[in-house]
Amino acid sequence: MPAPIDDLECAALDVASSLELTSLAMKQCADRLRSNSTTFKSALRLLIRTADRPGSKIVFTGVGKSYQIGKKLAATFTSVGTLSICIHATEALHGDMGVLVPGDCVIALSYSGATEEVLRMTEHIRMDKRVCVVGMGRSSDSPLGALCDAWIDSAVASELSDSVNAPTCSSSLMLAIGDALAVLLMNRRQFGPADFARNHPGGHLGRSASQGAM
């Protein structure tokens, strides 16, 4: 049985503390990036090269929560001008790797760096040097890191719960890094309100973008 919430004020403060912990994870990642960006710049170089090459695309992959993050990021990248898709690593091993073409860049999402399906997919990609792989997760010193051309550090000190190690801070950080990359590529290509209005005509965002482009 769930424990009764006797004190809603305490519950609200618990949520506030969780938000602060998530924010701290992002700040710590930003601090690491400011102090040493060498590895990150290698990943940026590959992503920019892919985004600038006509016909090439950025392909996110993962399983579980990482796959859900990849789907969201692929949608964001595409909506702001960088062609992107997301494929499930398991489905990739059963035919979906056919979407990869020379010049693509795969962003493999695995916080542990040891997700079996992602490793198998990456190993298969490594047989074809015409597609590069950027990993994102806790440590480049991992089975996935050893297979990648570049690595994006998304390590966190802890998740929100000490007892249940569900992806929380780590998944939020992955998402935030991906959004930041999408905006970086958007700004490089001078993608503006008129471009966004063409890609996103529906809903409140579409109406606002259309008005801003006038």
What are these regions (language model features)?
Residues 18-25, 73, 77, 213:
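Short, basic/glycine-rich phosphate-binding loops at helix/coil junctions
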Residues 30, 34, 185, 189-190:
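Secondary-structure transition/hinge residues
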Residues 40-44, 86, 196:
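Aromatic-residue hotspot detector
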